[in-house]
Amino acid sequence: MSPVAIIACVCLAVTLTSISPSEAIVPTRELENVFLGRCKDYEITRYLDILPRVRSDCSALWKDFFKAFSFKNPCDLDLGSYKDFFTSAQQQLPKNKVMFWSGVYDEAHDYANTGRKYITLEDTLPGYMLNSLVWCGQRANPGFNEKVCPDFKTCPVQARESFWGMASSSYAHSAEGEVTYMVDGSNPKVPAYRPDSFFGKYELPNLTNKVTRVKVIVLHRLGEKIIEKCGAGSLLDLEKLVKAKHFAFDCVENPRAVLFLLCSDNPNARECRLAKRFYRIA
């Protein structure tokens, strides 16, 4: 799940004068207050009948999170940097409801329906607290940069992806039963399955033998050319990888529920008019 609109800035700690405007990223203001506020909101009001609460309180979680990147050169971070935080924030995920996604952030989350149908990483406590936030460490006090974060493209990949890579790994490791993976089958520039995606690098490799089946949903965007189909191209590569891990594999293209979701935004699309006839929709 390569988090679109999710920026965990684990950036190179350089002086502000060396950062050009085009490279600057503005960090989230009052990061600690935002973190603690989201944490308390989650604890009291979010997913109460869907996901369990964690044992650590919000202050303890903040300490583990802040300790992971503060007073450090961000380019020296790796996937183990946030280990204590994810251990403290770990939740037991409901069986048969874990969902992964690549390139279909909005559609996947609309389909998951805030945990009612599926659980996404962004529905878990770590994902909910840090989604869309920006932060970066520095060696000088107060340990993190409050004004500007540089672009982290110069950092090694393990540093750039230290937070969300570990988040994806931990999330996948907790999955049980059937898992669902939604991909974009209409993108001419990017394969539906990529080995270098978050799913390819962190999630698929960390699925345990508690998983029984991987169900792939291929989303074909309305009015756009179909680029990839089940059983061919990168999806055939994915099928082989899944079966090599001894999981059952299913693949479907624009299933009825997904098509209806797409048609809710564009009911006059050709595919939607045909669906109305086929499914006898009013």
From Swiss-Prot:
Instruction: Give the record's GO biological process terms.
Output: positive regulation of B cell proliferation; single fertilization
Reaction equations catalysed = NAD(+) = cyclic ADP-beta-D-ribose + nicotinamide + H(+); nicotinate + NADP(+) = nicotinate-adenine dinucleotide phosphate + nicotinamide; 2'-phospho-cyclic ADP-ribose + nicotinate = nicotinate-adenine dinucleotide phosphate
UniProt name for this protein = ADP-ribosyl cyclase/cyclic ADP-ribose hydrolase
In terms of pH, the activity is described as: Optimum pH for NAADP(+) production is 5.0 from either 2'-phospho-cyclic ADP-ribose or NADP(+), activity is much higher at pH 5.0 than 7.4.
What cystine pairs are annotated?
39-58, 75-155, 136-149, 230-251, 263-272
Q: Where in the cell is it found?
A: Cytoplasmic vesicle
Q: What does this protein do?
A: Synthesizes cyclic ADP-ribose (cADPR), a second messenger for calcium mobilization from endoplasmic reticulum; ADP-ribose is a minor product. Synthesizes the Ca(2+) mobilizer nicotinate-adenine dinucleotide phosphate from 2'-phospho-cADPR and nicotinic acid as well as from NADP(+) and nicotinic acid; with NADP(+) as substrate preferentially catalyzes NADP(+) hydrolysis rather than NAADP(+) synthesis, about 70-fold better at pH 7.4. Has cADPR hydrolase activity at very high enzyme concentrations, which is probably not physiological.
